[in-house]
Amino acid sequence: MISNVLKRASVLARSNGIQSAFYTTTAKTEASSSPQMKIKTAEKKDHFVNFQVYRYNEETTAKPYIQTYNINLKDCGPMVLDALLLIKNNIDPTLSFRRSCREGICGSCAMNLNGSNTLACTKKITDCLSGDTVKVYPLPHMHVVRDLIPDLSHFYTQHKSIKPWLEPAVDVPRYNGKEILQSKENRHKLDGLYECILCACCSTSCPSYWWSEGGDGGYLGPAVLLQAYRWIADSRDSIQKDRLAILSEDQMKVYKCHTIMNCTAVCPKGLNPGKSIANIKYLLAHN
């Protein structure tokens, strides 16, 4: 019955000189494909920018140096990572840096751009220009493997020390193919925590972390402490006391935070590690 009604409506529309949506769409498509109907797009203008890039290779040079590349923004995409890829692919294949997702998810391309830590894949070139120059450095106060690649080994060791995984209660079946459920309220407590991508922008912008001693002790830094609180706050976890005990073994792991808040200022995901550290301090004082 419905199909008959549609057919009658179509016949009536044509008899009244009204085109159906199909014919209208077809006509528009044919018109747009016509050479006379093509829309002219504005051509990109030349815009040259100097990229001053930190270079270091312990195999070929004893000291780091700055190398300048003159790039026409007309030839690359809008992000700093686009310019670095242009340099590597077309100008200097020896330039080394990390990159992967190109959409602010993996954290691989974290670096220091004009004095501020951020992700090269989400930072527009025009947003970090100083005159006609962009200064590109590796994350500060880290050993440099090569060029823009920092050594994050110690950072990952610290992250491992907080047991960054879920430890459910013993009586919760682990391998029955079902989720460990939690209420909406408890799930909401993880907002602003689980989004951390461990890019290390916050930790390497923190003076307290710069002054921290290496090895197993010392200040854990904002990124690792935010991750620590992420698991402490998870209602599905059963070892909150153990996690707090790990953090209280050495007071400097947490209390070396002096609320400078560089961490919150530079986080490319808009998170607040300083708040997480304050919450940990509160729990340590009341447990």
From Swiss-Prot:
Cofactor: [2Fe-2S] cluster; [3Fe-4S] cluster; [4Fe-4S] cluster
Span of domain 4Fe-4S ferredoxin-type: 186-216
Binding-site residues for [3Fe-4S] cluster, renumbered to this chain: C206, C257, C263
Transit peptide, start-end: 1-23
Stored InterPro entries: 2Fe-2S_ferredoxin-like_sf, 2Fe-2S_ferredoxin-type, 2Fe2S_fd_BS, 4Fe4S_Fe-S-bd, 4Fe4S_Fe_S_CS, Beta-grasp_dom_sf, Helical_ferredxn, SDH/FRD_Iron-Sulfur
Compartment annotation: Mitochondrion inner membrane
Pathway given in the UniProt record: Carbohydrate metabolism; tricarboxylic acid cycle; fumarate from succinate (eukaryal route): step 1/1
Cellular compartments per GO CC: mitochondrial inner membrane; mitochondrial membrane; respiratory chain complex II (succinate dehydrogenase)
Binding site for [2Fe-2S] cluster: C101, C106, C109, C121
The EC number(s) this enzyme carries: 1.3.5.1
Chief site of localization: mitochondrion
PROSITE patterns reported in the protein's UniProt record: 2FE2S_FER_1, 2FE2S_FER_2, 4FE4S_FER_1, 4FE4S_FER_2
Keyword 4Fe-4S: yes
Domain of life: Eukaryota
GO MF annotations in UniProt: 2 iron, 2 sulfur cluster binding; 3 iron, 4 sulfur cluster binding; 4 iron, 4 sulfur cluster binding; electron transfer activity; metal ion binding; succinate dehydrogenase (quinone) activity; ubiquinone binding
Pfam families: Fer2_3, Fer4_8
Classification via Gene3D superfamilies: 3.10.20.30, Alpha-helical ferredoxin
Residues at which [4Fe-4S] cluster binds: C196, C199, C202, C267
Sites where the protein binds a ubiquinone: W211
Quaternary organization: Component of complex II composed of four subunits: the flavoprotein (FP) SDHA, iron-sulfur protein (IP) SDHB, and a cytochrome b composed of a large and a small subunit.
Function: Iron-sulfur protein (IP) subunit of succinate dehydrogenase (SDH) that is involved in complex II of the mitochondrial electron transport chain and is responsible for transferring electrons from succinate to ubiquinone (coenzyme Q).
Name of this protein: Succinate dehydrogenase [ubiquinone] iron-sulfur subunit, mitochondrial
UniProt source species: Dictyostelium discoideum
